[in-house]
Amino acid sequence: CWFQGANMVEHLTVLIVGCVAREHTISSAYERSPHVKRIVVAPGNDFIAYGRQKEVITDGNCSLKDPMSILEIARKYEPDLIDVAQDDALGAGTVDLLQESGFLAFGPTQAAARIESNKRWSREFMKRNGIPHPNFRYFDSEKDGINYVKELYSRYPHRLIYVKASGLAAGKGALRSENLEQAIRNIGRMREFPDGAGDVFLVEEGLIGEEFSYYAISDGATYRIFKSAQDSKTVFNFDEGDQTGGMGSVSPAMVTSPIAEEIDSKLIKTAIKGIGEEKLPYTGILYL
């Protein structure tokens, strides 16, 4: 156990990597632990340290896309545990660098984090392992993508599809298309995403139904499901407008037991098993 021997109340320092409401919530959970004395959130934000019962520090002298800058923060505060929560930091290999430098870091490695940071790899992983997924094609050419959607809409004029950036796009990378004009426009928008997130993009079948997600915590071999959630993915009510991050969620989601069992067996169990068989054990929180 990572706090084995830490029998004193208020003993540990925890570093949380991230800067938004997620990290605020995570820091509040650590604050309730009798084992935690001090919490550092990097880069954090001004509100995170407000009105706290324990010492909560924010340190903005780092970039989430620069693992070395986060390592410097870790060396400064010498935390007992580092919780790497943010997508960009995981995708950049922050956990790998921290672990190689002797720190106890919670989160997936850069290779395992591709299940979120590289949508092309993620869909191919699902296909290899028989995990249910929408039909998809990926492209690195705007022209090829446009030719494909022209052919698709010539056969299915009212098809719902999503044009999706393969890389990390702050929750904004999936663009809904209900006709050819929208699809062509959304393919053109792929070049607007920073850091080349849309250099490779997917054209995916749109699925109709109730959307929700499950959280599982895994050590790379075993796992436990502990939460479900239904998040608001679009800017406006009633699923209108572009997708974005930070619009809030409801937890737990209203899911019947048979569906929950199916999610466990067909999605989470299969994903943990498959990623382990590919020698990329996933440790941390898996959100499917």
Segments from the language model and where they lie:
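Short acidic-hydrophobic, aromatic-tinged amphipathic segments that line or gate anion-handling sites
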Residues: I57-K65, R137-S141, S177
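ATP-binding N-terminal substructure of ATP-dependent carboxylate-amine bond-forming enzymes
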Residues: G5-Q110
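A conserved helix-loop-beta module that forms one wall/lid of the active-site cleft
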Residues: F106-G173
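General beta-strand structural signal in soluble alpha/beta enzymes
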Residues: I16, V41-A42, D83-V84, A105-P108, ...
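Internal nucleotide-binding/catalytic subdomain
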Residues: G173-L288
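Short, charged, surface-exposed secondary-structure boundary motifs
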Residues: A49-R52, R114-R120, F236-F238
